Swiss-Prot record:
The gene is fis. It comes from Shewanella frigidimarina (strain NCIMB 400). Disulfide bonds: none annotated. The lineage of its organism: Bacteria, Pseudomonadati, Pseudomonadota, Gammaproteobacteria, Alteromonadales. HAMAP family: DNA_binding_Fis (MF_00166). Signal peptide: none annotated. This is DNA-binding protein Fis.
Length: 101
């Protein structure tokens, strides 16, 4: 089951902005892309019921996010955890979940 750890980035997306050293970035493009993808998913169900959609969406977003962050930090887990707003142990657990350790 999904580890319901508080995630600073999720909170920042919820309030509609991400603070950086150079200013504020509004993640509207990301939000719009997720909305289109989820809408597309439901349109392809052809009347069938979906289950565990929340878990599926989180996994589909979380895995590439972790991959990109780890590339950006050149594998530095401490830096990656700080960027994500989670502790390093939680990051390790998530990396293991997706086979990225």
């Amino acid at each position: 089951m999904f580890d319901q750890t508080t995630n600073t980035e999720v909170h920042q997306l919820t309030v509609g902005k991400i603070e950086t050293a150079n200013g504020t970035i509004k993640p509207q493009l990301l939000r719009d892309a997720v909305k289109r993808a989820v809408t597309n998913f439901f349109s392809q169900l052809d009347g069938q019921e979906a289950s565990e959609v929340y878990e599926m969406v989180l996994c589909e977003v979380e895995a590439p996010l972790l991959d990109i962050i780890m590339q950006h930090t050149r594998g530095n887990q401490t830096r990656a955890a700080n960027m994500l707003g989670i502790n390093r142990g939680t990051l390790r657990k998530k990396l293991k979940k997706y086979g990225m350790n």
